[in-house]
């Protein structure tokens, strides 16, 4: 049986490279799955050193359940599963000159408005 001296060295090199890649993987939203609790977080894109901008980010619950029969009868296109979700939104919303102004100083889980204009 012939032993090649390069094989253990190559294996150790590959193993150390793998550990280096895993260790250097960023501990950011993608690494955590993007599901922290609903809270205020600084927006790095729009913030300036003298004027930080915060926004509500995080996960709230979502669930799916069988559609009740009485509801299914009233649907134009009946579906078997109904889903319900809440989003992380600003607690206080005011209007200023007919423009919605969201004051992101406190966050909570509430109705998702991302699809509404």
Curated annotation (Swiss-Prot):
> What's one Pfam family the UniProt record gives for this protein?
Hormone_6
GO BP terms: namely: G protein-coupled receptor signaling pathway; positive regulation of steroid biosynthetic process; regulation of signaling receptor activity; thyroid hormone generation
The alphabetized UniProt keywords are: Disulfide bond, Glycoprotein, Hormone, Secreted, Signal
| Listed PROSITE patterns | GLYCO_HORMONE_ALPHA_1 (PS00779), GLYCO_HORMONE_ALPHA_2 (PS00780), GLYCO_HORMONE_ALPHA_3 (PS50277)
Does the keyword field hold Glycoprotein?
yes
Which Gene3D superfamilies does this entry report, sorted A to Z? Cystine-knot cytokines (2.10.90.10)
Q: Which SUPFAM superfamilies match?
A: Cystine-knot cytokines
Q: What is the annotated signal peptide range for this record?
A: 1-24
**Primary location:** secreted
Q: Where in the cell is it found?
A: Secreted
For this record, the Gene Ontology CC terms, alphabetical, are: extracellular space; follicle-stimulating hormone complex
Superkingdom of origin organism: Eukaryota
Disulfide pairs? 35-59, 38-88, 56-107, 60-109, 87-112
Q: Which residues are glycosylated?
A: 80, 103
GO molecular function per UniProt? follicle-stimulating hormone activity
Q: Which family does it belong to?
A: Belongs to the glycoprotein hormones subunit alpha family.
Q: What does this protein do?
A: Shared alpha chain of heterodimeric glycoprotein hormones. These hormones bind specific receptors on target cells that in turn activate downstream signaling pathways. Involved in gametogenesis and steroidogenesis.
Relate the assembly described in the record.
Heterodimer. Glycoprotein hormones are heterodimers composed of a common alpha chain described here and a unique beta chain which confers their biological specificity to the different hormones.
Can you name this protein? Glycoprotein hormones alpha chain
Q: Origin organism of this chain?
A: Anguilla anguilla (European freshwater eel)
What gene is behind this protein? cga
């Amino acid at each position: 049986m012939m032993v090649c001296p390069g094989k253990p060295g190559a294996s150790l090199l590959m193993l150390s490279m793998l550990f280096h890649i895993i260790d250097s993987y960023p501990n950011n939203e993608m690494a955590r799955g993007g599901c922290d609790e609903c809270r205020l977080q600084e927006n790095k894109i729009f913030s300036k050193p003298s004027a930080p901008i915060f926004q509500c980010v995080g996960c709230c619950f979502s669930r799916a359940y069988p559609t009740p029969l009485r509801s299914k009868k009233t649907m134009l296109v009946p579906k078997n599963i109904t889903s319900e979700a809440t989003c992380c939104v600003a607690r206080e919303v005011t209007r200023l000159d007919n423009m919605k102004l969201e004051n992101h100083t406190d966050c909570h889980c509430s109705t998702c408005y991302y699809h509404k204009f």
